[in-house]
């Protein structure tokens, strides 16, 4: 194709794994990039012991980015929000709970398009992991893309991340025709 999806890691050191999953049963096959330090594995050491290898079984559930066989790509980025610029999103409604990397796995497994990814995200209360706050860039094979971010109404009401709401920034002005509050990315 003629589409490129790129990102960088700002970590000084990381122990990275590329993970391929093909779960079947209506879910997409995908490749994802994993920072094994999220599983407690030292960035400066090889994965050698049986205990370390056992931990890597959880790798499919902590992706930082990836692409599925439908052409949906997703990356997670730090968003530096709240007190100290690192208050995790911790939305509290009656929706089911999901963590940041699990949301990315859900998108890779089930989304056929950016619209599907947004619809999936809207179904959950996000609880960011790793004592950080994140937003997501999602793109698909048609060239559509969006940024999914959870933001508070203002800085004075974002002390604990509980009041944040999903805000979607689309690259397609046609999708925004009924809204006066948008920007093109």
Mark where each language-model region is.
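C-terminal, well-structured catalytic/ligand-binding subdomain of enzymes
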Residues: 1-60, 65-66, 76-109, 115, ...
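Short, well-structured alpha-helical segments that form the helix of a local strand-helix-strand
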Residues: 114-125
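Short, well-structured beta-strand/strand-turn elements
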Residues: 128-129
């Amino acid at each position: 194709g003629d589409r490129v999806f790129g990102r960088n890691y700002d970590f000084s050191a990381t122990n990275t794994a590329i993970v391929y999953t093909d779960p079947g049963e209506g879910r997409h096959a995908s490749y994802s990039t994993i920072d094994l330090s999220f599983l407690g594995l030292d960035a400066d050491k090889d994965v050698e012991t049986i205990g370390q290898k056992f931990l890597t079984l959880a790798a499919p559930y902590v992706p930082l980015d990836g692409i599925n066989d439908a052409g949906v790509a997703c990356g997670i980025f730090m968003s530096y929000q709240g007190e100290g610029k690192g208050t995790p999103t911790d939305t509290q409604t009656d929706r089911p709970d999901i963590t940041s990397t699990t949301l990315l796995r859900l998108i890779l497994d089930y989304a056929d398009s950016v619209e599907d990814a947004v619809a999936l995200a809207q179904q959950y209360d996000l609880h960011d992991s790793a004592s950080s706050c994140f937003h997501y860039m999602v793109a698909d094979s048609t060239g559509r893309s969006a940024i999914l971010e959870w933001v508070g109404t203002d800085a004075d009401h974002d002390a604990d991340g509980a009041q944040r709401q999903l805000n979607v920034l689309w690259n397609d002005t046609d999708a925004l025709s009924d809204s006066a509050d948008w920007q093109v990315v």
